[in-house]
């Protein structure tokens, strides 16, 4: 089988003056005028961008520069046609356009590579983005090479019936398939409110443009915070559509700066400073680690498409609903004007362009922070996430103004205690998000919560370099959104009947549970027993086979009926929980013998007591005892699991 001609990363860039480029105008006709939500009425000339990647910084003053980035998928067998012998073709494209081009390595298990294209251009004197983009010109050239590589080189690619999945010209049909990787926060500019923009682009270009659903077999190189935009149609029509899509993406990528003229700081320079190898590594890790279903919606069909190939819309009669999602972010009181001020604020952007409601709490004596509340009407199958985009804009406003000496920034979200449980499980624990993004993500202790916050809230604090912190915020909000809709769905679904064995089905062979003899039975009788099993089972299935097992789950309980202020059903209150976790033999040398201090860290972060069981000479297994309130015990177990996962994934 013929393989790609090269497996190396190709990086081509050079310092160039953004005002003296080899080409003076774009090749494709991309003057298009679109109205509708997500972008307003804008005329695009040249330019493109928004894939979410690394732009090479120019030596010019960063405050006057605008970075544009694209990411296009190329089948591995066609990569040689883009690179050329010894990189001659890609070098020629770079020299002709002045853009930086990076052909990513092939991720194991993928059939496609990402080709990343970036540029840095000086802004116009009034702060507007440049009218011409070298990155867009290079995108067109790379796209041409992808389409031409089959005829020029030949390759042992996929069969004709699978050709659409990889991009290129479908044999005999003349249909072209092109796929761009786009940051989730920029997808909204292509969809518009109610899908109006994407439908208008389809009609205008006579192509089929769609956001691929997550149930598709997407490449592993595409992270959870990215989507694939696929364009299908005749050759010239697809080129036309690519010009329009890339122009809208570029406008979205630079919307922050175009709305904040006169600002002295920009997140772009911090993104560039974060390192060029960070994001590709993060994509591979997050694709491998997080189950997609916990973060992503599974239906991205347009609600207005007449195309036969569009993902099927929800049938009439199903319960299609939208709910108000609410997020809260803490803002330093002296910086609140940067968000809501008439001259410097971004309220108009948030309310009119993104479509969210924004409320700011009154100052509270003794607190140097105020709460900004973001709310938006969203549906579970809506790929556009307005509340998340609004949070990212607010994060940019705050962090650009108060970076510390180490170039680290801090973002603090307020989350209701009842929702914070989704951040403590295997699939989305703060420790896993922290590990994957390179940030510190913590649930702060009760005494660290500011006075302006409710006693029923917890503070999730993200600390790290700006680009990593934004990625962590994306992953965190995706998880919270998924949990919120799950909660809403469960409220409308009748509760399933419970039994003493039901909650533990599916984990046999992985977990071993036994109630200790000192459990105090309450007046609820069998109901209390069921509650114990259910409570434990919310934690137990999160361990993978071989990662560890719970030997005993004993609870010293004092139960009483307590009034419930929400619509949830009243349940007995469990005040103390004790778990004993059997450690796999393979992780003991690293977790216990070599790194005993990790247990102290888990104890400190969770508030639970985490100790090694040493008072049983006859015991041959390695057991960790966790004791504390149910919340503390669950948090400690999640942290312990995170350490075990990281140790096993690192290998021997």
UniProtKB/Swiss-Prot annotation:
Compositionally skewed regions (Gly residues) per UniProt: 34-55
Cellular location(s): Nucleus; Nucleus speckle
Gene ablation phenotype (knockout): No visible phenotype under normal growth conditions. Mutant seedlings show increased tolerance to heat stress. Mutant seedlings show increased sensitivity to salt stress and abscisic acid (ABA). Mutant plants exhibit increased resistance to the fungal pathogen Fusarium oxysporum.
Designated name of the protein: RNA-binding KH domain-containing protein RCF3
Keyword RNA-binding found: yes
Annotated segments matching region Disordered: 1-63, 253-307
Major localization listed first in the record, in broad terms: nucleus
Tissue occurrence: Expressed in roots, cotyledons, leaves, flowers and siliques.
Known partners and oligomeric status: Homodimer. Interacts with CPL1. Interacts with RS40 and RS41. Interacts with DRB1/HYL1 and SE. Interacts with CPL2.
Organism from which the protein derives: Arabidopsis thaliana
Gene Ontology MF: a single term: primary miRNA binding
Gene transcribed to yield this protein: RCF3
Factors inducing expression: Transiently down-regulated by heat stress. Down-regulated by salt stress, osmotic shock, treatment with lithium or abscisic acid (ABA), and low or high pH.
Basic and acidic residues bias locations: 1-14
SMART domains, per database record: KH
Outcome of swapping residue 389 to K: In shi1; increased sensitivity to cold stress
Purpose of the protein: Acts as a negative regulator of osmotic stress-induced gene expression. Involved in the regulation of thermotolerance responses under heat stress. Functions as an upstream regulator of heat stress transcription factor (HSF) genes. Negatively regulates HSFA1A, HSFA1B and HSFA1D, but positively controls the expression of HSFA1E, HSFA3, HSFA9, HSFB3, and DREB2C. Forms a complex with CPL1 that modulates co-transcriptional processes such as mRNA capping and polyadenylation, and functions to repress stress-inducible gene expression. Regulates pre-mRNA processing under salt stress.
SUPFAM superfamilies: Eukaryotic type KH-domain (KH-domain type I)
InterPro entries named in the record: KH_dom, KH_dom_type_1, KH_dom_type_1_sf
Low complexity bias (residue ranges): 292-306
Annotated phenotype, changing residue 233 to S: In hos5-1; increased sensitivity to salt stress
Keywords tagged on the record: mRNA processing, mRNA splicing, Nucleus, Repeat, RNA-binding
Example of a GO biological process term: primary miRNA processing
Family annotation (Pfam families): KH_1
